[in-house]
């Protein structure tokens, strides 16, 4: 029996590690193309890794530093983007929740040192899980909402670039990556085709399947939809770009705060 395992290794999150998830779906469907609906809706549900580190809000990771090119002035940088459990500002509630999980009878650590610190539901204290289609929808939406102010690259907000160590300084310069944007587009196109095939709205398909998501994500999705509505009704110039980016970033931070300890279970 395969058991999911995950492990946090270093001081940040590489901005492209999520792109392999759709590759696994594609590989499975190469062998079992007739099982797509089953894979997305009916296969074993998947949990959420509770990493010992989490991303700081912009108010804590955006800092002004002396501008080396112009004496007496400052420039914006991103420093110490994540909080680790050894840091003094680490959430005590999150720390206690992780220790409680590790001390529970259901905790499992494999020989590689990876553990099953999976986020729990506040409702029943059980591991919170969703279908694969829901997990992909959440991933695609969150990455779309992480586009930079120009709507071009996916921000390197986790303090790391993609798998290219030559770019290690770019996250500190508010960097973003276009390769991740193309991967996000690939994921969104797959979601669109899957939802059109199996989750047709308004009951036009008698076999249509609902996508059940956590209430916290549903609220986040509604906020992003509202921000996009405002943006598309504007002149779509620089000020509108910044207003949308601010709204999307605020929504992302509020979502993270809402699930910092547990999902509500609703």
What are the language-model segments listed below?
Residues 1-266:
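Acidic, mature catalytic/reactive cores of soluble proteins
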